Amino acid sequence: MSDSNPGAANPALGPDADAAAGEGLELAQFAAGCFWSVELTYQRLPGVARTEVGYSQGHRHEPTYRDVCGGGTGHAEVVRVHYDPKACPYEVLLDVFWAKHNPTTLNRQGNDVGTQYRSGIYYYTAEQEKAARDSLAEKQKEWKERIVTEILPATRFYPAEEYHQRYLEKGGQSAKKSCNDPIRCYG
């Protein structure tokens, strides 16, 4: 195994090499607790063309929800966002990320506990990395507690089971752009 390519022996550790879902679109990955409400928040954002929920940053190839919830895969529940940077700059995605969750609770959001619920920004480019680190430094000034958000290169993305995709929208909550209805998470 080459040190420069950890994904050579384990595909889960390699970079997310998927292409965005359209010309002019870019990808971003965020972990902010249960992916259902995070996904709906990004679905409503003008400039976001597509969202997907799934698993990233772990070591098991092709994990399932059950595997991830078992805690042994190292994966986080993430939302992968396909966005138009001209209509929705990456910094706007970061603002939504910080507003959506408590970045000071380690491996927990509300009643959801486990490493899969950790806070993370997973970048695709050096520009995204810089913006993420700069935004974390600014947000830390607003919190008394230490922010525990990890900022790492985006590793391979594994889509969650179809059941989880657009879960809250399929349950009747609006995904219309700019919708401000409260998001209710339920399972």
Curated annotation (Swiss-Prot):
Record-annotated membrane-spanning stretches: none
SUPFAM superfamilies: Peptide methionine sulfoxide reductase (SSF55068)
Subcellular location: Cytoplasm, Cytosol
GO molecular function: L-methionine-(S)-S-oxide reductase activity; peptide-methionine (S)-S-oxide reductase activity
InterPro entries: Met_Sox_Rdtase_MsrA_dom, Met_Sox_Rdtase_MsrA_sf, MsrA_MetSO_reductase
Record's keyword annotation contains Ribonucleoprotein: no
NCBIfam families linked to this entry: msrA
PANTHER family documented for this protein: MITOCHONDRIAL PEPTIDE METHIONINE SULFOXIDE REDUCTASE, PEPTIDE METHIONINE SULFOXIDE REDUCTASE A2-2
Function: Catalyzes the reduction of methionine sulfoxide (MetSO) to methionine in proteins. Plays a protective role against oxidative stress by restoring activity to proteins that have been inactivated by methionine oxidation. MSRA family specifically reduces the MetSO S-enantiomer.
Protein name stated in the entry: Peptide methionine sulfoxide reductase A2-1
Origin species: Oryza sativa subsp. japonica (Rice)
Name of the coding gene: MSRA2-1
